[in-house]
């Protein structure tokens, strides 16, 4: 396994249960849609155990993808043609269920975006040791729209203040009165 930098996108997971939503955010970004992991987590039904494949498929469809899960018992099926990037279900360290994005497959190496590590290249043998045989295939549907669903820090903060505008006005005027020394 070799870590490397390439032209492929990789959105890092926020915590151990975010690998599925991070993979979906990576594929969305690859297709021109920036969307926050928190939004995907909510739509996918991510809980303390993470996200199941059905939740990822549902979230992908809400983002404008056509998605389906497939399972194979033949590891060599990875060399057959299918749309990339795709999400692969893997088992890390023999126990941890995890998702990765497959960006490129050749007979010599498989390039993945691991939301825990970044862009990584595996030999097919290394990949077969961790892959469960499950893939989630995604293609943009005709309804897919490129764009940016993320909000900057200021807009998120401002959005929280809007419901408190009456309180903020009172604080503002009280501070002016206090500063002017109108009340001792």
Which positions does each model-derived feature cover?
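Membrane-integrated ABC transporters
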Residues: 1-184
């Amino acid at each position: 396994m070799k870590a490397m930098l390439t032209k492929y996108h990789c959105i890092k997971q926020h915590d151990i249960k975010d690998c599925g939503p991070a993979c979906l955010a990576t594929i969305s970004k690859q297709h021109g849609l920036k969307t926050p992991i928190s939004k995907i987590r909510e739509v996918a039904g991510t809980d303390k155990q993470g996200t199941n494949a059905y939740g990822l498929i549902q979230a992908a469809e809400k983002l404008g993808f056509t998605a389906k899960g497939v399972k194979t018992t033949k590891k060599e099926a990875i060399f057959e043609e299918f749309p990339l990037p795709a999400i692969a279900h893997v088992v890390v360290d023999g126990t941890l269920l995890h998702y990765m994005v497959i960006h490129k497959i050749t007979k010599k190496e498989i390039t993945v975006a691991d939301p825990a590590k970044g862009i990584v290249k595996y030999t097919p043998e290394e990949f077969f040791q961790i892959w469960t045989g499950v893939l989630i295939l995604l293609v943009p549907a005709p309804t897919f729209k490129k764009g940016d669903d993320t909000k900057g820090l200021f807009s998120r903060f401002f959005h929280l203040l809007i419901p408190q505008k009456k309180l903020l006005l009172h604080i503002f005027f009280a501070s002016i009165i206090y500063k002017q020394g109108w009340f001792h």
